[in-house]
UniProtKB/Swiss-Prot annotation:
Residues at the catalytic site: 108
Gene symbol of the encoding locus: ilvC
Annotated positions binding substrate: 252
GO CC annotation terms, alphabetical: cytosol
Organism of this sequence: Lactococcus lactis subsp. cremoris (strain SK11)
Protein name: Ketol-acid reductoisomerase (NADP(+))
Pathway(s) served: Amino-acid biosynthesis; L-isoleucine biosynthesis; L-isoleucine from 2-oxobutanoate: step 2/4; Amino-acid biosynthesis; L-valine biosynthesis; L-valine from pyruvate: step 2/4
Biological role: Involved in the biosynthesis of branched-chain amino acids (BCAA). Catalyzes an alkyl-migration followed by a ketol-acid reduction of (S)-2-acetolactate (S2AL) to yield (R)-2,3-dihydroxy-isovalerate. In the isomerase reaction, S2AL is rearranged via a Mg-dependent methyl migration to produce 3-hydroxy-3-methyl-2-ketobutyrate (HMKB). In the reductase reaction, this 2-ketoacid undergoes a metal-dependent reduction by NADPH to yield (R)-2,3-dihydroxy-isovalerate.
Length: 340
């Protein structure tokens, strides 16, 4: 299905002009949205609970308040706290202070789409979802361009929800490179599927399986690390720049031939069937409920998964090898740690 890409010149209404904007949360996305909007001339305050993020926002020059106070002062509110915290923040701090005719925004549709947050009918609901982590949203903005984003007008109580979403996307720099209109359902389900089946879950499982295959065949773990993980960035960067075509033009004929004949042996029809099952769990809300239930129980499953992942042999070997490769580290990593 074809989509329309919108740019700065398509944002015809300065819907945020003269409005008080509250960014709720000052983590990876929160600091980027807030700083970019401020640099674009908007009136931005921060709503965040006491702690490191509260202190960081004040150090960065923002008027900073407890969440409820910030919401009460604002005309447009953007919720950029982690997904698992948004429901409680909304019920305890946002909902009691939300004014009729105000606008409530999100950068991911999880809580709205799956029904964990229900907004009164007299409030606009919108989304602006940059397709990049917060430190890149900020860095690319300061470099004079930006990152692509999705935007949604979900609940149009005032008749201006779409204009607010587009002006927000412009204010954080995304409309410089292009924004696409979508729905909460589409953004949420596609985003979760991409993370689980390909970008995070699928990729790490593939790398780990490749590493284990080589080391179980008595190849050196250090060499296996280079072959299945370290060189991944080189290939992904080529695809990022020019798709499969540029990647295949840049590798050897041997590698390209192996790509065509072996890829289908790894990603079989059975794998695709499993991907469809993963998508079904997302669409039905099963994954969302499992995630929320684990959080409410104190994260026993997530904690166990993290502990097991930390102890993987590929992680231990990689940590040692990267000590001799300072070029694998970057300032962006530091920025992400500061604002997560």
């Amino acid at each position: 299905m074809a989509v329309t890409m919108y740019y700065e010149e398509d944002v015809e209404v300065a819907a945020l002009a003269g409005k008080k904007i509250a960014v709720i949360g000052y983590g990876s996305q929160g600091h980027a949205h807030a700083q970019n909007l401020r640099d674009s001339g908007h009136d931005v305050i921060i709503g965040v609970r006491q702690g490191k993020s509260f202190d960081r926002a004040k150090e960065d020059g923002f008027e900073t308040f407890e969440v409820g106070e910030a919401v009460a002062k604002a005309d447009v509110i953007m919720v950029l706290a982690p997904d698992e915290l948004q429901q409680s923040i909304y019920e305890e701090d946002i909902k009691p202070n939300l004014k009729s005719g105000s606008a409530l925004g999100f950068a991911h549709g999880f809580n709205i789409h799956f029904g964990y947050i229900e907004v009164p009918e007299d409030v606009d609901v919108f989304m602006v979802a940059p397709k990049a982590p917060g430190h890149l949203v900020r860095r690319t903005f300061t470099e004079g361009f930006g990152t692509p984003a999705l935007f949604v007008s979900h609940q149009n109580a005032t008749g201006h929800a779409r204009e607010i979403a587009m002006d927000w996307a412009k204010g954080i720099g995304c409309a410089r490179v292009g924004i696409i209109e979508t729905t909460f359902k589409e953004e949420t389900e596609e985003d979760l599927f991409g993370e689980q089946a390909v970008l995070c879950g699928g990729l790490t499982a593939l790398v780990e399986a490749g590493f284990e295959t080589l080391t179980e065949a008595r190849y050196a773990g250090e060499l296996a690390y280079f072959e299945v993980l370290h060189e991944m960035k080189l290939i992904v960067d080529l695809m990022y720049e020019g798709g499969f075509t540029k990647m295949r033009q840049s590798i050897s004929n041997t590698a390209e031939f192996g790509d065509y004949v072996t890829g289908p042996r790894i990603i079989t029809d059975e794998v695709k069937k499993n991907m469809k099952l993963v998508l079904a769990d997302i669409q039905s809300g099963k994954f969302a409920q499992d995630f929320v239930d684990d959080f409410k129980a104190g994260r026993p499953k997530l904690t166990a998964y993290r502990e097991a992942a930390k102890n993987l042999e590929i992680e231990k070997i990689g940590a040692e090898l990267r000590k001799a490769m300072p070029f694998t580290q970057s300032g962006d990593d530091d920025a992400f740690k500061i604002y997560q």
